[in-house]
Curated annotation (Swiss-Prot):
MF-aspect GO terms: protein-transporting ATPase activity
Gene: secG
Family as reported in the entry's similarity comment: Belongs to the SecG family.
Chain ranges passing through the membrane: 2-22, 49-69
Protein name (record): Protein-export membrane protein SecG
One GO BP annotation of this record: protein secretion
Location in or out of the cell: Cell membrane
Composition-biased stretches (Low complexity): 99-115
Organism placement in taxonomy: Bacteria, Pseudomonadati, Campylobacterota, Epsilonproteobacteria, Campylobacterales
Xref: Pfam families: SecG
Amino acid sequence: MTSALLGLQIVLAVLIVVVVLLQKSSSIGLGAYSGSNDSLFGAKGPASFMAKLTMFLGLLFVINTIALGYFYNKEYGKSVLDETKTNKELSPLVPATGTLNPTLNPTLNPTLNPLEQAPTNPLMPTQTPKELPKEPAKTPFVESPKQNEKNEKNDAKENGIKGVEKNKENAKTPPTTHQKPKTHATTNAHTNQKKDEK
């Protein structure tokens, strides 16, 4: 049945292609997709014989596609698992006799039971909590050099002492071991190198 429907499907597809190619174009590129010629009963009246034949063949194509899908699914819709044989004589997972190892049984071996006995009142704590410290421990505050300079300026203004402010050279932190102080010669060499690259 499916082979006959498949053959009919191929014939219908070829006929639809031939009928569509034989039709005369109604719009011929003018006003495409927006004119009245694109409607079913265009400006020239009802559709011609070829247009009706195209619609009929298209309807047959859709019906044949649905029928082909239904019969194909009915014929070949069986699962592979339906045809497999099951072995009904399976060995039992637990031996019928009581030959279990008693050391693996948690009721016979209390060391295998990790859970302790539940307390009679689970809302009551078993231990008393330790007292909390009265004051939190104070941590030392380390200021950055810039913040330290600002604080010194503010203190000097508050005390009304003039001339206490440090100049920028004294306020700078000394360079660390991984920082090299730049000299005038190194900066000039760097700018000369950029000029040479240009």
